[in-house]
Amino acid sequence: MDFEKSLDRFLRQIARVRTGSKDTENAYRRDVERFLEYLREHHIDSFEHVTKTDVSDYFTQLRDGEIGGKPLSNSSYARNLSSLKSFYRYLNRFEGIKANPVRIFKGGSIRRKLPEFLTFDQMETMLNQFDLQDPVQIRNRCIIEVMYACGLRVSECAGLKISSINLAEGFLTVLGKESKERMVPFYPRCKQLIQYYMNNARGTFMEKVEEHDILFVNQNGRPISARSIQLICEKAGEDANLPIHIHPHMIRHSFATHMLDNGADLRIVQELLGHENLGTTQIYTHVTQDRLRKVVDEAHPHSKSAK
């Protein structure tokens, strides 16, 4: 489906039926284009395939500044939601699209939830469950390990190139938002696992296709999609019997939280995550502060005696 043609037809429809300013039309275009870019990054190629979870993840990342570069204000959130609702009403009425995953979302103030993350023990339980004799399991373990080691977005992981990895130095070059590059180091276990995947799994998938530079591939040798990585993470959490629903961004949250828990400088974490705005990274300090408060409340004798 050609997303851009649908957007152009939507904007023409808006211009016909409304008398709003050019600024209003530009706001519609900007809001919807950002959403369409998110769909493309996640290899979602049809409006019918967009789920409520996709929309929820999109607004979570938009709200927290992962998309757009800075955390969203209440008024900006309301405008973005209104734009997408108008766009989907147009799709339903004029383009034969039956799905409307935006309908259930409400405007008003944003309830800022702290990022969900795994504890270190939960992460290790999930990582250590994989059978490293099976090529698919090797690949899946390597995907999750690399995302956790480097704090990658799912689209960054899916697009990771072999040529961007310096195994000797333990660095990889990530192509992030707006094609901005950043260098991220990884720990020795991650290095060993990448080498193990390259030597024992990737070639199995590449037997019938021409060699290319994308690191992670599906069983047909084609570049793996962000949606496939999402499903891999969900299944890994279920197989590890973790009590929470796992999604790729939770692994990125875990990276940031564990780094700050262990004394990493906030600005270094900002750089590693590829955040333009320090405020986007600061939300993780609230997570660590809440955890510290819980420890004090549970362990300090004066806190315990006050209960």
What is the role of each PLM region?
Residues 1-307:
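Conserved catalytic core of the tyrosine transesterase superfamily
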